[in-house]
Amino acid sequence: MSTPAAPLDKDAARYAELDRRLVAAVRGVRLLESVSWPAAAQEKFLAGWRVGKLAMPVIEYRKHDFAAVREELAAVEKACDPAHPIGRYLHLTCESWRIATRLLDVVGTHRVTAFSTRLFGRPVEMLPGEGPTNLEAAMHFVELADELDQELSTYEPAYVLPAEQVQAELQEQIDGFFGVGEVKVELDPTLIAKAAASPTRIRLRTNTGFSEYDRNQLLMHEAYVHTLTGLNGRQQPVLGSLARGSPRTTATQEGLATLSEMMSG
């Protein structure tokens, strides 16, 4: 028999309600989905780039009205005490979502850079602990990856795995780790990236070839970082927003996912 959960204290109960309001307010804000190019535009751009004919596509970004979202975020933020640990967490999370909506207001214009910088930083900014810069750190890992690629190229099979095979193999491995039916691996013809993950679903781009190395990277990157983080957040009894994350956690999430690829080989 499971032990009943202890009742929340007054502060925790209040912040749990504010967190629920935050989650409800940003439910329709899809940052990556809103700024992604259509698959056809991406393919045309890359095809031109490969033959030295670089031409930027003209993208018609869908416009949204986020005024009500920002109003609710401001109300939640105002109700938080920034000196309280949960209050500070909600304050920073509301702020990052508000910046994200401002970015989406101006997507497709040069003004997007200012909001993107506030969310994700700049290449020349120093990492905590007196550096290096983001760019220098990235180049360091690129060099390590290049060395690894040279070693792996000797052993990497020349054949390409179809998306359907990778889907089946990943599903088997994921079922063995998370439990059967907990996380589904699906094919998506509209996906821009090769893969994307949520707490309960990992999508692979249809009609795309994968290498053996790709398959292993996907397991580490998508399943063991993004999906596992989301599932862990869902187990948090007070702050449901941890299941989704926020724009301010993107850099950490992607950094962990990329590092997991490299550490696992």
Task: Report the location of each language-model feature.
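Active-site recognition of the HExxH zinc-binding catalytic motif
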Residues: N216-L231
